[in-house]
Amino acid sequence: MLEEENSQMICQIYRIYTKDISFEAPGAPQIFQKEGSPDIKLDLDTSSNLLAENTHEVVLRITLTATIEGQTSFLCEVQQAGIFFIKNIENMQLKHCLGAYCPNILFPYARECISNLVSKGSFPHLHLEPINFDSLFMNYVQQEAEKQNESDPIIIKNSEQD
């Protein structure tokens, strides 16, 4: 019984915090005179690092760039981070936990920060749709596997006999 408890997979949140935040409206106030909906470009990235044994920091970076008629309306960047205690999770499961599970936890906090920044910048309400981090992670794993297969050398043995 005790052995089962010691081998149970654990992923606990120690802390969630905003690591870095930035909002720019380089075209203000002239941009407020333009009509139409802005084109929104979303860049997303995750990273993680080991802080101590079984303790990981995961950072979700979201950068939004809004343009109207080719002019930048606003640029918003949020780095939402969390410290997670992760135990008895190894290899691919650990990569999935750090690359998909933890970012899923962080995303609502980042989305709220972005929404608040955009509205305080006097721009129309912006609601980011949920992101399927599991799917993004699986695509990443597949791309890495394809890169690995492409970089594996092909060895052709020529066994000519005289």
Curated annotation (Swiss-Prot):
Entry-linked InterPro entries: SecB (IPR003708), SecB-like_sf (IPR035958)
UniProt-recorded name of the protein: Protein-export protein SecB
CC annotations in GO: cytoplasm
Coiled-coil features, chain-numbered ranges: none
Gene3D superfamilies: SecB-like
Function: One of the proteins required for the normal export of preproteins out of the cell cytoplasm. It is a molecular chaperone that binds to a subset of precursor proteins, maintaining them in a translocation-competent state. It also specifically binds to its receptor SecA.
Keywords: Chaperone, Cytoplasm, Protein transport, Translocation, Transport
One protein family per Pfam: SecB
Family: Belongs to the SecB family.
Signal sequence residues: none
Location of the protein in the cell: Cytoplasm
